[in-house]
Amino acid sequence: MLLLQCRNPTSPPKPCGLVPNVKMSLLVFLGLLGVSAAMPFQMPMPRMPGFSSKSEEMMRYNQFNFMNAPPMMPMGPYGNGMPMPPHMPPQYPPYQMPMWPPPVPNGWQQPPMPNFPSKTDQTQETAKPNQTNPQEPQPQKQPLKEPPNEAARAKDDAQPPQPFPPFGNGLYPYPQPPWPIPQRGPPTAFGRPKFSNEEGNPYYAFFGYHGFGGRPYYSEEMFEDYEKPKEKDPPKPEDPPPDDPPPEASTNSTVPDANATQSIPEGGNDTSPIGNTGPGPNAGNNPTVQNGVFPPPKVNVSGQGVPKSQIPWRPSQPNIYENYPYPNYPSERQWQTTGTQGPRQNGPGYRNPQVERGPQWNSFAWEGKQATRPGNPTYGKPPSPTSGVNYAGNPVHFGRNLPGPNKPFVGANPASNKPFVGANPASNKPFVGANPASNKPFVGANPASNKPFVGANPASNKPYVGANPASNKPFIGANPAANKPSIGTNPAANKPSIGTNPAANKPFVRNNVGANKPFVGTNPSSNQPFLRSNQASNKPFMRSNQASNKPFVGTNVASVGPKQVTVSHNMKTQNPKEKSLGQKERTVTPTKDASNPWRSAKQYGINNPNYNLPRSEGSMVGPNFNSFDQQENSYFSKGASKRVPSPNIQIQSQNLPKGIALEPRRTPFQSETKKPELKHGTHQPAYPKKIPSPTRKHFPAERNTWNRQKILPPLKEDYGRQDENLRHPSYGSRGNIFYHEYTNPYHNEKSQYIKSNPWDKSSPSTMMRPENPQYTMTSLDQKETEQYNEEDPIDPNEDESFPGQSRWGDEEMNFKGNPTVRQYEGEHYASTLAKEYLPYSLSNPPKPSEDFPYSEFYPWNPQETFPIYNPGPTIAPPVDPRSYYVNNAIGQEESTLFPSWTSWDHRNQAERQKESEPYFNRNVWDQSINLHKSNIPNHPYSTTSPARFPKDPTWFEGENLNYDLQITSLSPPEREQLAFPDFLPQSYPTGQNEAHLFHQSQRGSCCIGGSTGHKDNVLALQDYTSSYGLPPRKNQETSPVHTESSYIKYARPNVSPASILPSQRNISENKLTAESPNPSPFGDGVPTVRKNTPYSGKNQLETGIVAFSEASSSQPKNTPCLKSDLGGDRRDVLKQFFEGSQLSERTAGLTPEQLVIGIPDKGSGPDSIQSEVQGKEGEMQQQRPPTIMKLPCFGSNSKFHSSTTGPPINNRRPTLLNGALSTPTESPNTLVGLATREQLKSINVDKLNADEHTTLESFQGTSPQDQGCLLLQA
């Protein structure tokens, strides 16, 4: 330190005065060189552990150190003296070459001695040779404007490094003999070597990265990074991490060849190996690192060598940034080329950080994260664009000084950057001219220095590759250390982009579990959302979200959300689930402002089912991201609502900007601002009130159709009950998160799964709205119905439709219009809603007619379902969602609505994300079919099993169970509304239906024998009870629904997709899949349902089969039914699945209804009821009339009966077998559904006529089990 002090305070002669100049030079050089060589090695070693990048960079820069860069670095330091560059390069290479190369110093000891005085001269001369000095000093000055802070910081950093090691900046050790003054100058030299960095891309021994702030700068920068992360500069140092490449870029900038070569190699290196690998993640990582661990990126950036140098370069980088944002094709290419990661880079890495993460991290994330991200990609420049100025310091890690004179160093970077490029031609030409000596470091040094930056990219660029392993690895390697913040943070930061998405992106990881999974998942997912969304919406998040995403975090989240919904929607980003989640979470806050806070909370909870974070309604705004919700909520209509409650359509309005689909959708019923989400409520008869909107983002029209009716009235009037139900719907939405996937297929199917369109067509509108109309008949939704008057055509149609099928046909039209809208879903959902609603009336009225017999039967379904609805608001909807979403059922039932939403939805969201993607496709089909058919015969839901789904009656048939579970989960009251009103007008008094039937329905009568979770799906439960819970014999009859052998394979795929979708699909699907002869019936079921759906168009009974299959197969309730009604293995299996967590809870939560409905029947329902049904078949038929009126069980049993009944099944079996690519087993189920439909027709008529015996007789073939189901109902 004495030497340093002597040298530092005094010009080199003074150290020479202390010691003979030669001795001093030798001692200082040898000591400093040895220490610097040793110390940088030592320091790199510590930094290596701490900052892989830095240590590696240091090591690499140690390579630099002995490379020409050190001589250049002295040149830079002497250049700090400023006169040095031209003269110094020759002298430096001789003098400093000895200095830098450990071997040389002995030979060069004397030359250094002369050079010491000469170095003072050289410093002057160097400043002179840096004829760019006018430029360089200006760049320095300009940088010094900002660098004063940076330089001061660099000084502080450099000076502390001076004390830290005598050569505080790894650079100093080398140049310190020349830098006695420059050392204090060096921070200033950093200010000035900034252009020395420009020139010397030693950037104070940029090559040695002693100039990087010196390695000691690394050492300190390690601290500095840690400190600066606290400062706001960490993002700026994040920029320097991008500037790690920027040094190369700086070199690149300085040396045009180096710039092109280095930048390209660096970019290429970074882009392909690291840009993609490190930067790709680091694009995400760095942002996150910047976000969370900006210090390490900062360190990386600083480690990159010249935080202070970065100052000038940041100005330079701003140009790069301007070029880079997208212009930087290396960066852009990486970002975009690494579409997947690139989206991370592109959206997450670059755009996401800016847009997606930027919004979250915004200032620092944008600043540092972008910088880091681009810097990570080795495009210090692309990051610079991301960073803005972040990469202004790209060559020089001036990303730190990114905000300040950096821009001057964009202006001055034309000057300074031109010193970096121009002065680098001048200065860099010294480092190109002198880089024969100096520029050989930049070319030699690019072989040396640029090789540091290329060699050093092996060294420095390897820091950018190595250091990207080191520096980029800082962004991965030093990100183990610094970039571990950038990778720790990249685990933190990239993981923030995944990890810090755990951290920052954990907001985006909560989201990015959904969102970070989007950002990782979503960068796979969010990044894919932001890939997907960034492809579309994340690009909006990049572009629009530069505008919109910047705001996006706030409200553009809503805007972004819808847009992403549209994007994700069209992209059918199942990954966007995660992505979308991230977005969802982002959107959460906007969604949060949805009119229904509880629903918003639910939505948010729903949308962030995986992330409990969204629970905070603000958080769930992210889910409002339709890119996420579009996935999740799109997949799950309820999730959509959860993401953006229908009430939150205002948020959807916010989302609407992004969710273009939402905008049109919600436009049709903008009065129901929240309604757009209903669009997803294809299967949201119950939930659409609250959840459909978010989920229906893709189907705003459907959702709007639904939500207008359902959501507003429930939200407004049934707020307590309906809202509670909607909470269930919201959680049903989350439960519908599987539905979400289900709905997402709507979203996607809008684009991808058009088959789901039938479902969506019917489901969103018919399902939700007809149910709402029916439910409107119910006390709950009567209010809603009044408020539904926006959609009153459907409401009245439903209520009126129930009496008149043309009304149902209208609703069917509406519902199919919804599907049409669903086609529009992305865009014109609302408009097509009513419009297409009528067109579908034309096509579907026949189905309603076909369903008309079931219309009479349908009242039972509504009745049965309605009882589900009635209790459902509080318990039944939880039960239904729970039953439907077995995982969710418990929470819903236990926690009236919200707990279930949270419980099952979180779990189910993951499950639905897992399973829903495959299943929502099928479910979309099923829902399309079921809802479509059901919607067609809104009260002939019985006629078309699918119709059961669309409407509560259909829901009640067991499809209704599933969909109603979804709906019930989302809008249990709505479902009550729909089902009950429809049912009430015909079969039961509202009060009776509501109270009595609800419980009966909730019991799922026979079906809920296993589990009461199917309150709404009583039909489905009964269906499934016959199928699932009923003994194998009952399963024979129930086979259409859940006959393990036949219907499970057939209907069950339908069931699971449509009914079991969210939770039960996971549970029932898993169980039934495990237990079912056709474990992959869902896989088959989707094709079957889809096939059947086409056949549904062709053959309503086939559709009914599909629908019934789905009704059976839609086993949210069926799952409990499976559980309990399967009396044996299935119930046990499902019970194992459900009971531990949800069945018991569900039973507890649904005790009033579930116990009343099916829990008592669980044990006895399958066996006892079967025995009773067999023993008391006639007796039960007579007893059954009240129960028989619970045709849902008949629907199921009818299916089962059809399944058992050979002739009807056989008659239709070939059709369905042919029509539905179902296994013969599935075929019987389908046939059962057909037979059931026919039977249900007659039974329904009889039932409407109160001819229960006739109904029983119709089911008499199935009586033992049908009656068992009926008995359970009774």
UniProtKB/Swiss-Prot annotation:
It is found in: Secreted, Extracellular space, Extracellular matrix. Residues 117-127, 249-272, 331-344, 486-503, 522-549, 565-574, 588-598, 753-766 have a biased composition (Polar residues). One of its GO terms (cellular component) is extracellular region. Residues 143-158, 225-239, 575-587, 715-727 have a biased composition (Basic and acidic residues). GO terms for molecular function: structural constituent of tooth enamel. Expressed in developing teeth. Phosphorylated by FAM20C in vitro. Residues 787-801 have a biased composition (Acidic residues). Residues 1-38 form the signal peptide. Keywords: Biomineralization, Extracellular matrix, Glycoprotein, Phosphoprotein, Secreted, Signal. This is Enamelin. It comes from Mus musculus (Mouse). The lineage of its organism: Eukaryota, Metazoa, Chordata, Craniata, Vertebrata. The gene is Enam.
